[in-house]
Amino acid sequence: MELSEAEVQVLASLEKARVESKDTDRHLLEAEADRFWIFLEDWSDAYFSLQKKGLIEGDQKGYRLTESGHPLAQQYHHQRPDMYWYYYQRFYQAARASAAHSELCRQVFGKDLCQEGQTDMAALDDLLELLDLKPGEEVLDLGCGAGVIAEHISDQKDVSITGLDYADPAIAEAVERTKAKRSKLKFLQGDMNALDLPENSIDAVISLDTLYWVSNLEKTLSMLMIAMRPGGRMGIFMNHHIADGDDQSELAPESTDLSKALTNLGVSFTTRDFTVQIGDFWRKNWKAAADLKQRFESEGNGFIAESLIREAEEDYLPDINSGKIARYLYYVQC
C-alpha cells in the first residue's frame, strides 16, 4: 500500500501514543509532532485518507489504529521515531559534496572525516590508544555512518573493519566510496537491537555515541560479547544527562546505565572522564555552525547548520552550563 509521508508520520505518532498510553485526540497528537522538526509534513488530509484506507478509525477527539494499521504503525514508529531518520536520509550525500561541512569538520574535529558526531580527533586518538589495534585484527564499528572514520582507522592501523548502520544512505555511500578497499572494509545495513554476528569473529568494537539507540543495553552487549574473540575489547563513547532535580551522583561513572549493564554482565571495564572536553566541543561546534550557516545555505544544505545549532542550543549547552551532563570513554575487556 502506497502511503504519503504525512500518513506515515500520523501512523508513527499514533503508535507512539499507544505505547506511551497517551490520548490520541488530534490536538495532542499534533502538539508532539515538533519532534519531526523541519521534516514535519502537513497532516491536514492524512487522517481522512488513512480512514479511507482502513488503517485508522475514530475522529478528532481520538483516533485508533485498526487491525490493518497496527503493523504498519509499529514499523514506522520503530523506523521514524523523530527527526533523525529524515535527517540522515539527506545528510550523507549532502555532506559529501559540502565545502562548508568540510570546513566545519576541520574547525571542530581537527580533520575532515565527514564527521557527524561528538568525537574529535584527539578523543578518537585516545580511544585507539586504549584499543591498541594490531594489524590484521577484525573490528566492528557500530553506527559507522558513511564509514569515513572506519576507513581512516583501517588505513592507519592496517585492520579489517565491518561497519554497521541503520541508515541505508550511509551504507550506500560507504560501499560506493570504498570499492577499492573491499578486502579491508565491509559495510552492512542493520539494527543494533538485533545483531546477528558469528561467534568468536571480532577482536574489537568501536561505538562513538551510538548506543543511545539501543533499547536493551544488556541484550546488545551480550550479543557483542558472544562475537568477541578471547582478548577482545570495546571502546565506547557515551554522554549521560540528568533532569532537573536529579542528584548529581547519578552522573558518576559507576551510576550510568552503561556501567550498570556492564557490571550486571560481569564484564571488566574502566572509564575516562571527557566531560570537560564535551563542553568545549559543543561550544566550538555551535560557533562553527553559526559562522558557516550562510555558506551551508548557499549550497542548499542549511538544514545541517540548523540542526547543529538546534542541538547545541536545546540539547547540549543548557545541560553543559548547568552541570547536568557527563561524558565517558568506556574501555571494556571481554
Regions found by a protein language model. Name each.
Residues E218-R233:
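A short glycine-rich, Lys/Arg-flanked "PGG" loop and its adjoining helix->strand segment in the class I
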Residues R233-D257:
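Conserved class I S-adenosyl-L-methionine
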Residues F274-C334:
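Conserved Class I S-adenosyl-L-methionine
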Residues G117-P135:
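Conserved alpha-helix/loop element of class I SAM-dependent methyltransferases that forms part
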Residues D59, Y63-Q107:
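N-terminal, positively charged/glycine-rich alpha-helical extensions of SAM-dependent methyltransferases
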Residues N193-V205:
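A short acidic, Gly/Pro-enriched loop at the edge of an enzyme's catalytic core
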Residues A204-N216:
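A short SAM/SAH-binding and catalytic strip from SAM-dependent methyltransferases
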Residues E138-L142, A146-A194:
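Class I SAM-dependent methyltransferase SAM/SAH-binding core
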